């Protein structure tokens, strides 16, 4: 165990401990499967799988005679064929059988038939938050998407209100500010006037519409009020004579008033535009946009003044023709259809989130209605018109109140919902088509749609990803990732700058630093350290409550919506022993503004300075002294650090290292307190303190050199001794890239910031040979090679050491079965598994046919189809596995067995490997220098690494200098430090430590040249820096081709290492050779070394025979060009110097030869 010294400016202990870092995965899946609640038979009815089955059942047959009812579901743990480890080894999925109990009820007779019906298998989550699918660990990444609900926004001159449901048709309102009309769009189809839409939904008269949206005032009609009334709008129809009606919404003229007076109208109802705010709880409007829509209606239907209302038929016709153009219309059907689009639970679902958002926006208390109501539509229109008039403000689409997170559970629920709707359709068909009394529950349910949907989701969904397993931090970050892409999300090409940008609501919820560089920047982000997802899917972050200027220890989690307009102080605001603020003015933030406030006005206080960043950013010491771009690179590169054989924990840490190791799931923790009985490299046994009997022991299997998804090595090493007492939760074995239970991604090295003979030009790194000799950066990489033994039409393939036409020397690494021996060192081209395949009759010569007929099967020829070590790979065989049908029961069709060989290679640090610090300071090893040639300190200590000082000023990552200084002090004082982010050690503190260690307080020292022994002219900054070796190793990239595959059409060599391809000689390379007049070099590069087929063969012949050569024919690409032109209709022929035609195809050659 390491004892760390806390060097932060704040207190060592936090107010609130970090939550379990992978709880977003674990909680979401538990909510989906509800295994704990199932045991007590009390699952929540509106969550996860339970809600899926409750939505679909009961099902009734069309004739009403039979009903299929659902009782409960359960997961059969006994059906688990393999453990997690076996699944990985045998390429199987870790899943259990799902069954549901159904009752088939005959309504006429009352008979009930009960059956537990198989519903396919369901992948189970491991305690590390991953799934094992076909032997590989996968992670379901959480998706961040637009929240259902209502949103108001503006684009160009158009104001929009959009009601987004969880499932169903989108409803969009838009105001065209140039024309002052309000339109409705359903599912982005053509526009409909809003008044027509309202009439179709039941507000069928002008009076009803006006009464809904406007405050109405009564006014007497007399000579005194004439002037006041003129130009105002009627709110209620006035009928004077039989054929004389003044309609609500019409403008009143002087002539109209005269008519009123003559006909004895004493009082009229007018629209009160000014009183829109005078009635509490009512959202009245002051805009005349709706009245303009009445005018537009009149023009549309050619109505004259004095005519009555629009008929129901004409309204429905107008609306329905836009919804379903070209469909025959009956008025009742049209009305039904329109109502079911928004008001029926089958077709429309706001989801509890959508309803919550609508109620929050309009101040309603309803949290249960899942469909739209007329009130929602009226409120939305009123709010949009109030925004248009400037009485309300637009929404911010990128506000985290308008974006929510869908985690594993919800994604899976949606998959099951889609599949179950297909199951329901099939079941209903079967109910009506089969003989009723012969029905059985299991015959009605078809499992295929469910099985295929779940399989497809886990295998191919954009959100189901191959786990990044390079190191524990990479695993952890992958599980905490938020992705805006994927089904129902954004697309990379259409996402603009605003969506990707940092928003003030991200504070404490999403990390502003950690995101990929490149096209996905800002679309893939990381969860902040303390963030949680609430029941509605909104991100929440914790705050300490402040009451009357006094800070309490009460913690409240707030979502972005709740946090709006609250006044929040920073975590490092100075507080005295009585929890009162020391300063009179405190630095705070309110929404997006940063200001100062008196303590009395403060509502909340941050929990910790690191709450606004993600886990990997919180591992960077002195983060606040780095430029954010470099911090981003530092966060991303820590995830690429390869686990080393002998890692060390960083001398300068941030206090997060232990937490990351503990929550990542790679270390082994004690389940119960007890005494260690056995501790070997493969197994630990602990006798718990509260054991039930002597056989009640806790056993732990340790992983030894297992392969990860990224071909790194997964290995456990024991941290305890036999007889030792351990506590519950204590770390008893280290995993990859952990040391003493802490994350240890690299090593501490003695660094000098000094240029050295140009070897560290442009970020290159100069390294001492000591590092290589002592294996400080040696890592183990394990590759898996597999081969299938198939049943062919000509007979089975065989695994054997008896391979035709192969020398005994090559076969001496195989055992008698034809499988390579464990422990053998293999090189490229070596045979790992000898396999022969029967040859087809077509390949056999007449002589062989004769022998076969004489000697029978024995003489049948076979083809060598052995598994060989590919180019660029060598290493030691550490394991061989044979998987047969007896082992797993379901190999792919036609496959008898699968053989896997694991080859491990120890990779030392070498020139070309990429290294990096934690501050985005990356570089490639340019030279490994003998220890005696490295620059050394006055006491003779040689440096381990030389970095270029020019890599610091322009990159603005000063954190690396501060880390080096403090690391130097720590090394000589034998101390390890915790330097939490945003409250790191001050310069004074670092200088004090340096003095204590006996160094100059700038940590600059005189260095001596290893070649000459002379001191360098100036003092050099020296320190201890933590460096990582990244997963960009030169061994994986180094590639050379002699002869290899060619592309079929162009006959040019393929490209890339995977295809064993060649180097591309492009347009610009040709210019370079032309500039030097290197005609012959250029000719051979463009012909015989590329795609001159006949020339290639000829030159090979000449080289073998030793004849001086200068052959070149016509490159194949020229022929391709010619054929391309012929395809366009040009008849082209080519001729040589002597006027003879050169054939381009074999057909042409024949023709020319004939003539």
Curated annotation (Swiss-Prot):
Catalyzed reactions per annotation: RNA(n) + a ribonucleoside 5'-triphosphate = RNA(n+1) + diphosphate
Keyword Iron-sulfur: no
GO biological process terms, semicolon-separated: DNA-templated transcription
Superkingdom classification of source: Bacteria
EC id: 2.7.7.6
Keywords annotated in UniProt: DNA-directed RNA polymerase, Nucleotidyltransferase, Transcription, Transferase
Enzyme class at the top of the EC tree: transferase
GO cellular component, one term: DNA-directed RNA polymerase complex
GO molecular function: DNA binding; DNA-directed RNA polymerase activity; ribonucleoside binding
Assembly information from the UniProt record: The RNAP catalytic core consists of 2 alpha, 1 beta, 1 beta' and 1 omega subunit. When a sigma factor is associated with the core the holoenzyme is formed, which can initiate transcription.
HAMAP family in UniProt: RNApol_bact_RpoB
Task performed by this protein: DNA-dependent RNA polymerase catalyzes the transcription of DNA into RNA using the four ribonucleoside triphosphates as substrates.
Family: Belongs to the RNA polymerase beta chain family.
Protein name: DNA-directed RNA polymerase subunit beta
Gene field: rpoB
């Amino acid at each position: 165990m390491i004892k760390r010294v806390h060097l932060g400016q704040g207190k060592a202990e936090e107010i609130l401990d970090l939550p379990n870092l992978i709880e977003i995965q674990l909680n979401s899946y538990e909510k989906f499967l509800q295994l704990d609640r199932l045991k007590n038979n009390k699952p929540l009815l509106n969550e996860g799988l339970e809600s899926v089955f409750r939505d679909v059942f009961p099902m009734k047959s069309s004739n009403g005679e039979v009903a299929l009812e659902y009782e409960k579901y359960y997961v059969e743990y006994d059906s688990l064929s393999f453990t997690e480890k076996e699944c990985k080894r045998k390429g199987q999925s870790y899943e259990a059988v799902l069954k549901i109990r159904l009752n088939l009820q005959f309504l006429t007779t009352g008979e009930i038939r009960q059956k537990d019906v198989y519903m396919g298998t369901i992948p189970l989550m491991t305690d590390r938050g991953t799934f094992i699918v076909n032997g590989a660990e996968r992670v379901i990444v959480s998706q961040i998407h637009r929240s259902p609900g209502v949103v108001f926004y503006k684009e160009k001159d158009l104001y929009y209100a959009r009601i987004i449901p969880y499932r169903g048709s989108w409803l969009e309102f838009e105001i065209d500010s140039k024309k002052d009309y309000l339109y409705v769009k359903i599912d982005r189809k053509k526009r409909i006037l809003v008044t027509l839409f309202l009439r179709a939904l039941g507000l069928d008269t002008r009076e009803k519409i006006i009464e809904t949206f406007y405050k109405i005032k009564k006014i007497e009609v007399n000579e005194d009020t004439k002037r006041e009334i003129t130009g105002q709008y009627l709110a209620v129809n006035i009928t004077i004579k039989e054929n004389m009606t003044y309609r609500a919404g019409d403008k009143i003229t002087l002539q109209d008033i005269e008519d009123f007076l003559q006909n004895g109208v004493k009082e009229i109802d007018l629209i009160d535009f000014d009183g829109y705010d005078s009635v509490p709880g009512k959202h009245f409007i002051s805009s005349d946009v709706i009245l303009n829509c009445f005018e537009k209606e009149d023009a549309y239907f050619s109505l004259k003044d004095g005519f009555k209302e629009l008929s129901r038929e004409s309204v429905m016709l107008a609306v329905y023709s836009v919804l379903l153009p070209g469909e025959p219309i009956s008025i009742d059907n049209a009305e039904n259809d329109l109502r079911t689009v928004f008001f029926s639970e089958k077709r429309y679902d706001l989801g509890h989130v959508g309803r919550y958002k609508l109620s929050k926006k309009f101040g309603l208390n309803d949290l249960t209605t899942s469909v739209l109501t007329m009130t929602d539509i009226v409120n939305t229109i009123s709010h949009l018109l109030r925004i248009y008039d400037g009485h309300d403000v637009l929404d911010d689409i990128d506000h985290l109140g308008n974006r929510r997170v869908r985690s594993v559970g919800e994604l899976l629920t949606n998959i099951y919902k889609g599949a179950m709707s297909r199951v329901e359709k099939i079941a209903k068909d079967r109910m009506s088509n089969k003989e009723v009394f012969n029905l059985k529950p299991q015959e009605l349910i078809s499992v295929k749609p469910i099985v295929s949907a779940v399989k497809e989701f886990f295998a191919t969904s954009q959100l189901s990803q191959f786990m990044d397993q390079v190191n524990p931090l990479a695993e952890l970050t992958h599980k905490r990732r938020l992705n805006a892409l994927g089904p129902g999300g954004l697309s990379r090409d259409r996402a603009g700058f605003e969506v990707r940008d940092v928003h003030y609501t991200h504070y404490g919820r999403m990390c502003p630093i950690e995101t990929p560089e490149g096209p996905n920047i800002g679309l893939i982000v990381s969860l902040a350290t303390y963030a949680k997802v609430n029941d509605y899917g909104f991100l929440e972050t914790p705050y300490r409550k402040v009451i009357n200027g006094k800070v309490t220890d009460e913690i409240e989690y707030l979502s972005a919506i709740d946090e709006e307009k609250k006044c929040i102080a920073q975590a490092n605001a100075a507080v005295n022993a009585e929890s009162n603020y020391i300063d009179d003015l405190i630095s705070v933030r309110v929404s997006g503004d940063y200001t100062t406030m008196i303590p009395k006005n403060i509502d909340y206080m941050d929990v910790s300075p690191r709450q606004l960043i993600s886990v990997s950013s919180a591992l960077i010491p002195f983060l606040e002294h780095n430029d954010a771009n470099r911090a981003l690179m530092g966060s991303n590169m820590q995830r690429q650090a390869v686990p080393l054989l002998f890692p060390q924990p960083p001398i300068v840490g941030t206090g997060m290292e232990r937490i990351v190791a503990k929550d990542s799931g790679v270390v082994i923790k004690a389940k119960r307190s007890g005494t260690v009985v056995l501790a070997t490299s493969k197994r630990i046994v602990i006798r718990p303190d509260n054991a039930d009997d002597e056989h009640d022991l806790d056993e732990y299997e340790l992983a030894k050199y297992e392969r990860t998804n990224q071909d790194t090595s997964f290995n456990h090493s024991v941290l305890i001794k036999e007889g030792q007492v351990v506590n519950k939760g204590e770390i008893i074995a280290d995993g990859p890239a952990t040391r003493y239970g802490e994350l240890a991604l690299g090593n501490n090295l003695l660094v000098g910031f000094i240029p050295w003979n140009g070897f560290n030009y442009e970020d290159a790194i100069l390294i001492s040979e000591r590092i290589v000799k002592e294996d400080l950066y040696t890592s183990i990489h394990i590759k898996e090679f597999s081969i299938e033994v198939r049943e062919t039409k000509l007979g089975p393939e065989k695994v054997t050491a008896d391979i035709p036409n192969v020398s005994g020397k090559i076969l001496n690494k195989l055992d008698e079965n034809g499988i390579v021996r464990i422990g053998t060192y293999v090189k490229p081209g070596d045979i790992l598994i000898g396999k022969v395949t029967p040859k087809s009759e077509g390949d056999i010569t007449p002589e062989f046919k004769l022998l076969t007929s004489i000697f029978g099967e024995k003489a049948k020829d076979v083809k060598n189809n052995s598994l060989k070590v590919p180019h660029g790979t060598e290493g030691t065989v550490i394991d061989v596995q044979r998987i047969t049908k007896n082992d797993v029961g379901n190999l792919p069709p036609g496959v008898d067995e699968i053989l896997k060989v694991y080859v491990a290679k120890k990779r030392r640090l070498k020139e070309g490997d990429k290294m990096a610090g934690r501050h985005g300071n990356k570089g490639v090893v340019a030279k490994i220098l003998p220890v005696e040639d490295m620059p050394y300190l006055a006491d003779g200590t040689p440096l381990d690494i030389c970095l270029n000082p020019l890599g610091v000023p322009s990159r603005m990552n000063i954190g690396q200098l501060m880390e080096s200084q403090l690391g130097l002090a720590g090394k000589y004082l034998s101390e390890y430090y915790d330097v939490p982010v945003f409250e790191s050690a001050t310069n004074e503190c670092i200088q004090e430590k340096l003095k204590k260690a006996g160094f100059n307080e700038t940590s600059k020292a005189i260095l001596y040249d290893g070649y000459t022994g002379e001191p360098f002219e100036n003092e050099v900054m020296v320190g201890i820096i933590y460096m990582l070796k990244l997963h960009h190793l030169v061994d994986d990239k180094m590639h050379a081709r002699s002869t290899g595959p060619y592309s079929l059409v162009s006959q040019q060599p393929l490209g890339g290492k995977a295809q064993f391809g060649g180097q591309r000689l492009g347009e610009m390379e040709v210019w370079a050779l032309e500039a030097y007049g290197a005609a012959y070099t250029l000719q051979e590069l463009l012909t015989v070394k590329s795609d001159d087929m006949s020339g290639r063969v000829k030159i090979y012949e000449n080289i073998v025979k030793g004849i001086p050569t200068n052959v070149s024919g016509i490159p194949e690409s020229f022929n391709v060009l010619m054929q391309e032109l012929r395809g366009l209709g040009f008849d082209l022929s080519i001729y040589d110097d002597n006027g003879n035609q050169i054939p381009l195809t074999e057909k042409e050659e024949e023709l020319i030869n004939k003539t």
